[in-house]
Amino acid sequence: MDLIVMRFILLIFALVASSLALAESGKTLRCVTTHYPPYTIFDEQKNIFTGSDIELINYLNQSLGLNIKVIHLPWARVKKEMTLNYYDCYFSLATNTLREKHLEFTQHPTHVTKFGLFALDKSTLNNKDFSSTRIAMLRGVALPNEIADKYKILPKNIMHALSTSDSFKLLEKKRVDFIITNYQAGLWFAKNSVGIHARQFNESSLPVYIAFKPGVVDINLIDKQIKQYYEQ
């Protein structure tokens, strides 16, 4: 009898603790991201979000009874906000040592991406030496060593743009020879352009995650639901 009572008490405690750990009842969690198609697409005119990562956020809202409000910020602003503890969470976010000091990351990624190379001259996509070329990249995104070393890409030759859209403008104006960015995102931005060619780098993968301000949610419950979502 004592064992049954003890199990019942532990069950009640676990349920209560889980609900409290997720978020205060009815509290809105403000979650920041940036325009990152096709995973997160922000329509400025309609002020709405679509994309595969948004579908995951909607699933978490429904399955866990959360109220996550998605907020769009430019990437440069997103980087600054991570250390200020003003917002509750961020998504489509890669990990690094600095970010992990301020945020709790899920173990399961929202998606895994690869880098891509974009150019006006298709014949240059398979070059092996980029040491004398001009390359545009999104500011704040690190180029993996596996790619930089193999293709002799030098930091001094990289022009950092404030957005992926700006990178493509630089390419179209021939101010750079190449763009390196997320392959799928680059294809999305290039779809309305004429004469832009692409190839995918297979030397490195980039998983991205949802990250929460410490203490806002039970990160294990979030992880469990993300895993379940992708196993459906």
Segments predicted by a language model, with ranges:
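Short helices/loops that flank or line small-molecule/ion binding pockets
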Residues: I71-H72, A76-D88, T164-Q184, N192
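Extended ligand-binding regions for polar small-molecule ligands
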Residues: I54-S63, S123-M137, V141-A142, Y209-Q232
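Periplasmic-binding protein-like
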Residues: T33-Y36, H111-G116, K191-K227
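Extracytoplasmic small-molecule ligand-binding "clamshell" domains
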Residues: E24-T97, K101, M137, H160-A161
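N-terminal signal peptide c-region/cleavage motif recognized by signal peptidases
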Residues: V16-S18
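Sec-dependent signal peptide recognition
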Residues: V5-I12
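Acidic, polar ligand-binding/catalytic clefts
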Residues: K69-F130, L143, H197-E203
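Ligand-binding cleft/hinge of the Venus flytrap
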Residues: F42, I57-L66, Q107, D129-S132, ...
